[in-house]
Amino acid sequence: MGFRIYEIKARQIIDSRGNPTVEADVILEDGSLGRAAVPSGASTGINEAVELRDGDKSVYMGKGVLKAVENIINIISPELEGMSALNQVEIDRKMLALDGTPNKSKLGANAILAVSMATARAAAEYLGLKVYQYLGAYKANILPTPMCNIINGGAHSDNCVDFQEFMIMPIGAKTFNDAIRMSAEVFHTLKGILSKRGYATSVGDEGGFAPNLKSNEEACEVIMEAIKNAGYTPGTDIAIALDPATSELYDPETKKYVLRWSTKEELTSEEMVEYWAKWVEKYPIISIEDGMAEEDWDGWKKLTDKIGDKVQLVGDDLFVTNTSFLKKGIEMKVANAILIKVNQIGTLTETFEAVEMAKKAGYTAIVSHRSGETEDTTIADLVVALGTGQIKTGSLSRTDRIAKYNQLLRIEEELGSIAEYHGRDVFYSIKKQ
């Protein structure tokens, strides 16, 4: 009976931005250990599960997580001890019942998620399986097409670019290994282009460059140049993906989108939709995340009707990995994809439920990191287990991002001849161009 939980430990550690986060150890009766650390976001949806912070301004500027750690040790651990680590659903539902709030504000989503992920890791260790094998069983053989963040703007940097993330997707690669090589080559080529133009090549939270470009358009133009100079064809070998994070630009009082980092221009929902439609015609853009604000459901509907058959439209702040919001989106025919962030919802069980709902509705799903990350690689295993075929985990720099890519390279090697990389074919929610 060594598969039962013997003890749960927790501690406060540091994330990639130097802020505290929660790490948990789940120890089974046979000594099997599962360890997991949770991430945190910079731009967060208003409906996300609550990340419990201590609020003591004299310690870590109020961002300590000792209360969440105490909740694991004093509340969660005593209740889970003796339970089977092999029943992930039962473990997760027990924690949800202990919390008893709709947004996990009592125990903290950071406390609950750390234990949820660590439990899965402990169970995999007990069974002698890799985490992706344990969570995904025989279906776990699809490597994801990566969204590699190469230019940062908005809340992720200190420059004049309004939109948060400009990414590349190696849709023409044959393997994940090739996809990473192609992305790295474009990343290094872009660095040379920026340097020649006199721009800084320092990087933002997610490892992308944060140059003080003259306009939002210039970001796309230098990326196009980098793709070509690296020897690839834009739109065929490598496509562009965007996360403008427009909730950060939206003024709910005036219902306008304010391009506050660049021109100061104010756009209505209709004008924002036309803005994206023009960009999609001008650049090889295959995916736009949070193209409209989370509160602007009417704007989202207009955007989906306008370009939803051509481009993957990803709801992040809109859906916050929550089946209630996703159900609303499906019923309204809003967006055609969901971003999956485990810490937005707080348990692995709820994460699987969200992906299942998305797939049944014909929506694509992208497993994602957060801007505040750790060396934890759970999402790399998770994306293979879920078979979503897409991952968003930053640039080709910073160890907190590279850790996920390296884990996926290992997984592809382990899978050998049964490993699949679908490239452009992962975009089943849009018409093939």
Curated annotation (Swiss-Prot):
Main function: Catalyzes the reversible conversion of 2-phosphoglycerate (2-PG) into phosphoenolpyruvate (PEP). It is essential for the degradation of carbohydrates via glycolysis.
Location in the cell: Cytoplasm; Secreted; Cell surface
Source organism: Borrelia hermsii (strain HS1 / DAH)
Biological-process GO terms, alphabetical: glycolytic process
One GO term describing the cellular component: extracellular region
Residues binding Mg(2+): 243, 289, 316
Active site: 206 (proton donor), 341 (proton acceptor)
Cofactor(s), by name: Mg(2+)
Descriptive protein name: Enolase
Intrachain S-S bonds: none
Main location: cytoplasm
Originating gene: eno
EC class (word): lyase
Residues engaged in binding (2R)-2-phosphoglycerate: 164, 341, 370-371, 392
HAMAP family on file: Enolase (MF_00318)
PANTHER family hit by this protein: ENOLASE
Pfam families: Enolase_C (PF00113), Enolase_N (PF03952)
